[in-house]
Amino acid sequence: MSLEKDEEVVIFEAYLAGSANIFKNLIELLSQVAPIKKSDNSNKSIKQAFFKITKNGIYINIDHQSDILINISLDADKFGSYKYNFSLPELHIGITLDIIKDALKNVKKSEGVALCIRKKTFQTMPNEMSFSISSMDNNNASRGFVVKFNIVQNININAMLDGQELIEMRSNQFLGLCKDMGGSKKQIKVIVHNDSVVFSCNMVDIATKWLSFPIEEEVFQSSIHEKLYFLNHFKSEHIKTITKLATFDDTIKMSCVDDSIVFKSYITRCTPTKARHLPTEYIGKINIWVKAEPKKEISDDEDDL
């Protein structure tokens, strides 16, 4: 008996319990920094994220030309169930963020999320992913949506260097820094010199606020015979983007490489600040690179801090 034309095969499915809010926060972060582009199929302006799906996990990033680069990795072995069964070792897809962001805006921490990609037997490549949100309440009622995607080529997920980790700070410390120095159209100066990392901001041209973090001892000792120096200016709204990392873990690590600063965080299923009676479970990692503003003439007193 021949197969029906509309028969489907599952090529990818994954389920993560109690983590729908993690996907919500990830999509909100990606949507916040993704560049706006014209759709290939219409004149609409869209924001898009790129997913690389393999047997080892899900890897997500945005356009490499953005001023803020984001790489996210979700480990397959941290999912409650995870199966990838496709002829290609990697499936590269582009998904419109606005649709997913709107669909996930009301999810709860206790809800789980299931992802699924099916391919019709007559298709060479799939073109849809389904999201299902389930809860232990309401008699196990579930809801979901299906979003179309496009196949993309040559996703450079790990194109950037990480740099050497300099400091580890509490997420609430960084939230406080951004609150003190935030505001649109401001610049934050970041200096790495000797044994400290200093963030400073000019306040209405009449004062300067600064916050200093000591460089981790082992890093300082290993580079004591080298010139450890970095000075660049960054848009305050770009730095403020990093505050979203506080929703994933209690600590943020920072490093610098070339003209960028890199922020790293684990993605936890249950953040310690909200449920200290449960053990912290890491399900992935997130790296954010923030590019510096173009270099300008440095005055004689630029290094005062």
Curated annotation (Swiss-Prot):
InterPro entries in UniProt: DNA_clamp_sf
Recorded family membership: Belongs to the IIV-6 436R family.
Protein name: Uncharacterized protein 436R
Organism: Invertebrate iridescent virus 6 (IIV-6)
